[in-house]
Regions:
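FAD-binding core of FAD-dependent oxidoreductases
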Residues: 49-51
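Catalytic nucleophile serine of serine hydrolases
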Residues: 46
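Patatin-like phospholipase
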Residues: 1-43, 53-331
Length: 331
């Protein structure tokens, strides 16, 4: 086996998935350490958007090692550490597990204070100086794309580069059963899981040679789900992959048009789309698990999978083979 060709322009798309995106943090840490690859764009939804932001900010500061440090630091801060946090975390995971096996009352996030969202915003602003981003972004800078959905209009919303604020990240991570919708301008936004999970069709604007998708929800399962819990978990996985598949379908349609010579010109190119998949059998409730041991385990697993991907990349599963897409202008 041979690894991924070096000196290539790479765009990385990070699927959302709550605490499972600690796996994504591990993957990105490994990619940031490999300076042979030029990361020209990152995108993400929900927890994937947070990871993409932290890695992108390090690239903006021209310090890949800073991106690694930010990913480590954020997930350490996000882990349940105090006795109160540990007890609350264990209770939430337990309740989430019960909901997959029995009917339980649901509570609107508007019935209790938004302290959880406030804490996430505090952590984001601790790690990223958002007020600096507009001046840091240059035509040659890597691109960041974050997805959310407008609750009222149903329209997908994409935040790019300097448009990405702490509130934009909160909007992309606003799971409606847990968090209130986020008001931005005239829009009211929910989690990016309902729009583009993750955004992919915008990435060709950065003119990458390849798009690497960090996938949290598995495409395939080996065993038929039969219990209520298994059925609920598989339903959630399929829902999480719905928008991802739509994004890939968009690329495949362009592929078809180019192969039929209906689209011609130098602005079209082939872009390999590859997948780095978290293949562990985890249930939906564990997406809420913020225990330190679980977070560290997933990050280590992400690093391991990323290293394997770089070593065996040419044989690693591709998503629908090679796809020609509209290529953007290089900065």
């Amino acid at each position: 086996m041979t690894g991924i060709n070096k000196n290539r322009r790479i765009a990385i798309a990070c699927q959302g998935g709550g605490s499972h995106t600690a796996f994504t943090a591990g993957v990105l840490k490994t990619f940031l350490k490999q300076k042979e690859y030029s990361i020209v764009a990152l995108s993400g939804a929900s927890g994937g958007a947070i990871c993409a932001l932290l890695a992108w900010y390090g690239l903006l500061m021209r310090e890949r090692d800073l991106g690694v440090e930010l990913l480590d630091s954020f997930w350490k801060d996000n882990s349940a550490s105090s006795m109160g946090e540990i007890l609350l975390n264990d209770w939430m995971v337990w309740v989430a597990g019960l909901r997959s096996t029995m009917v339980m009352p649901e509570f609107s996030p508007y019935l209790y204070p938004s302290w959880a969202q406030d804490e996430v915003k505090r952590m984001l602003e601790k790690h990223v100086e958002f007020e600096k981003i507009e001046k840091l972004v240059q035509p040659s800078s890597p691109m960041l794309v974050v997805g959310a959905v407008d609750v009222l209009s149903g329209e997908f919303k994409v935040f790019k580069n300097a448009q990405v604020t702490a509130d934009a990240i909160l909007a992309s991570a606003a799971v409606p059963t847990l968090f209130r919708a986020v008001q931005m301008g005239n829009g009211l936004y929910w989690d990016g899981l309902f729009s583009q999970n993750p955004p992919i069709r915008d990435l060709p604007d950065a003119d990458p040679d390849e798009i690497w998708v960090v996938q949290i929800d598995p495409h395939r399962r080996k065993v038929e789900p039969k219990t209520v819990a298994e059925i609920q978990d598989r339903r959630n996985e399929l829902a999480g992959n719905l928008s991802l598949n739509q994004e890939i379908y968009f690329i495949e349609k362009i592929n078809e048009l180019v192969n039929r010579k209906l689209l011609v010109g130098s602005k079209y190119k082939f872009i390999n789309v590859r997948r780095i998949e978290m293949s562990r059998d985890l249930d939906y409730a564990s997406k809420l698990d913020r225990s330190s041991s679980f977070i560290q385990e997933l990050m280590a697993y992400g690093e391991e999978q990323a290293e394997d991907f770089l070593k065996t990349g040419t044989d690693h599963p591709r998503i629908q083979g090679q796809s020609p897409v509209l290529a953007g202008q290089r900065g």
